[in-house]
Amino acid sequence: MTQMNYTGKVKRVAIIANGKYQSKRVASKLFSVFKDDPDFYLSKKNPDIVISIGGDGMLLSAFHMYEKELDKVRFVGIHTGHLGFYTDYRDFEVDKLIDNLRKDKGEQISYPILKVAITLDDGRVVKARALNEATVKRIEKTMVADVIINHVKFESFRGDGISVSTPTGSTAYNKSLGGAVLHPTIEALQLTEISSLNNRVFRTLGSSIIIPKKDKIELVPKRLGIYTISIDNKTYQLKNVTKVEYFIDDEKIHFVSSPSHTSFWERVKDAFIGEIDS
């Protein structure tokens, strides 16, 4: 746990909610409280704290809204539906959140994020950040690409695509692909194959790979064409991708630390296992 510079100043708060009825109700309550509270100033511009209301999808959207301000912003999530990995409060705990924010001294919990650089055949480089994962797929035909780790060719991949996830993203699409669940205090990336072809002619490792922070992953497609690139909940169609590079970003996402913060393993248990009979 670390702490942002805290001077006791008025906290600038942005409230981001999805369109569901319960989310709108929670947002309305927060607006009504904060607008008359001298300790808070409601503003979506240059906020100190971003409150996301909905679920993990809404938190991902909030992250991308403020991804260029991560060194100044802390996030807090309220879930109004299913349990989320990035949300510490339920919709009936709004009063608890308000009380904790009034007592807040700038403490934060930080998680690593993914940096992606996509090079096109005309030399342009498209850069992006991901909180969960970035995937590359070729829908028309089998994707053929070299997987390079630290400038050394590791394997020639043939299949539907490749997913590279962060530790917190390891519980999302990566897990559905058979990847491992990685604790977010481990600064590493996870490369997981999507429906790889393995036979006498074509072979890949066939299992997820954990890549430490100091290492770099490169994916070099061997065929021109249209590739589907997904960055968290955003999807792009890019033509003639020549290289995709993956790194752990120097910046992290920061969450407001509070007594209500649920441990990572508790979140995993609640999401995938539930109550255990004694």
Swiss-Prot record:
Transmembrane segments: none annotated. Its main location: cytoplasm. Its cofactor is a divalent metal cation. It is found in: Cytoplasm. NAD(+) binds at residues 56-57, 132-133, 158, 160, 171-176. It catalyses: NAD(+) + ATP = ADP + NADP(+) + H(+). GO terms for molecular function: ATP binding; metal ion binding; NAD binding; NAD+ kinase activity. Pfam families: NAD_kinase, NAD_kinase_C. The active site is at 56 (proton acceptor). Its EC number is 2.7.1.23. Keywords: ATP-binding, Cytoplasm, Kinase, NAD, NADP, Nucleotide-binding, Transferase. GO terms for biological process: NAD metabolic process; NADP biosynthetic process. Belongs to the NAD kinase family. Involved in the regulation of the intracellular balance of NAD and NADP, and is a key enzyme in the biosynthesis of NADP. Catalyzes specifically the phosphorylation on 2'-hydroxyl of the adenosine moiety of NAD to yield NADP. This is NAD kinase. It comes from Streptococcus pyogenes serotype M1. The lineage of its organism: Bacteria, Bacillati, Bacillota, Bacilli, Lactobacillales.
